[in-house]
UniProtKB/Swiss-Prot annotation:
Keywords: Ribonucleoprotein, Ribosomal protein
Organism from which the protein derives: Colwellia psychrerythraea (strain 34H / ATCC BAA-681) (Vibrio psychroerythus)
GO BP term, example: translation
Family, as annotated: Belongs to the universal ribosomal protein uS2 family.
Protein name according to UniProt: Small ribosomal subunit protein uS2
Length: 242
C-alpha cells in the first residue's frame, strides 16, 4: 500500500496554509504556527492522518468498493479526473449538481439520457436529423457529459468520497453525511472540517500538493484492487507454479 512521507509533503508545499486573517478557528489544532502572515500546517499530524485515510481507501477497494473523487475548482479539476481514470474509479470535476447523491434516482435518468445520446451519435441517428436538431442534441450530450461523464458508469452510490477543498465542496459533504457515506477531505486552514470523517489538514490550492493527494489515493485504490484479485485467486484455488 502506498504511504506518503513528510518529505513528499514538504516538497509539494502541503504545509502552506492560507493567510492568517482568513483562518477558521476549527483548524487551530492542526496549525503549527505562522510565517509572513501565512499559517503553517503541522505535517506531523497531516502525515499519519493522510496515511490512515489511504489505508481506509485501500480497505474499501479490496472489497470492490467505489471511490468518488470530487474537486470542482480549477486547481483540482485535472488532477481529480486523472486520478479517477488511472484507478478506474469515478469523478466530479466541474460542478456538483445539488442532489447528485441524495436524488440519485433523478441523476440516474439523466445518465440514461446521456448514454442514449452517445449511442445516437455513433449509430447514425444524428446523421439522419436536420443540422439544427443534430447540433441541439450534440450540445445536450456535451453538457450532460461535462456534469455526469465521470459518474455515468458508477451504477449506484459510491462507498467513499475523496474531496479536495472541504469548503468548496460543502454540498457534496452534506449529501454524503445524510446518506452515511464516509468522507475523506483535504481541509486547508481557512476551511471547516465538520462533516469530514477523515480530515487531511493541508494546502488545497497548490497544483503539486493536489496532485500528490490524488495520486496517493489512486495508488491506494489500485493496491486494494490487487489484494482483492489475490484473495479471489486463492479462493478459486489458483496457485502460481513454482
Amino acid at each position: 500500500m502506498s504511504n506518503v512521507s513528510m518529505r513528499d509533503m514538504l516538497k509539494a508545499g502541503v504545509h502552506f496554509g492560507h493567510k492568517t486573517r482568513y483562518w477558521n478557528p476549527k483548524m487551530k489544532q492542526f496549525i503549527f504556527g505562522a510565517r509572513d502572515k501565512v499559517h503553517i500546517i503541522n505535517l506531523e499530524q497531516t502525515v499519519p492522518m493522510f496515511n490512515e485515510a489511504l489505508a481506509f481507501v485501500n480497505n474499501v477497494s479490496s472489497k470492490k468498493g467505489k471511490v468518488l473523487f470530487v474537486g470542482t475548482k480549477r486547481a483540482a479539476s485535472d488532477a481529480i479526473k486523472d486520478a479517477a481514470i488511472k484507478s478506474d474509479q469515478f469523478y466530479v470535476n466541474h460542478r456538483w449538481l445539488g442532489g447528485m447523491l441524495t436524488n440519485w434516482k433523478t441523476v440516474r435518468q439523466s445518465i440514461k439520457r446521456l448514454k442514449d445520446l452517445e449511442s445516437q451519435s455513433t449509430d447514425g441517428t444524428f446523421e439522419a436529423l436536420t443540422k439544427k436538431e443534430a447540433l441541439m442534441r450534440t450540445r445536450e450530450m456535451e453538457k450532460l457529459d461535462k456534469s455526469l461523464g465521470g459518474i455515468k458508469n458508477m451504477g449506484g452510490l459510491p462507498d467513499v468520497l475523496f474531496i479536495i477543498d472541504a469548503d468548496h465542496e460543502h454540498i457534496a459533504i452534506k449529501e454524503a453525511n445524510n446518506l452515511g457515506i464516509p468522507v475523506i477531505s483535504v481541509v486547508d486552514t481557512n476551511s471547516n472540517p465538520d462533516g469530514v470523517d477523515y480530515v487531511v489538514p493541508g494546502n488545497d490550492d497548490a497544483i503539486r500538493a493536489v496532485t500528490l493527494y490524488c495520486d496517493a489515493v489512486a495508488n491506494s485504490v489500485l493496491s486494494g484492487r490487487e489484494q482483492n484479485i489475490v484473495v479471489q485467486a486463492e479462493k478459486d484455488g489458483f496457485v502460481e507454479a513454482e
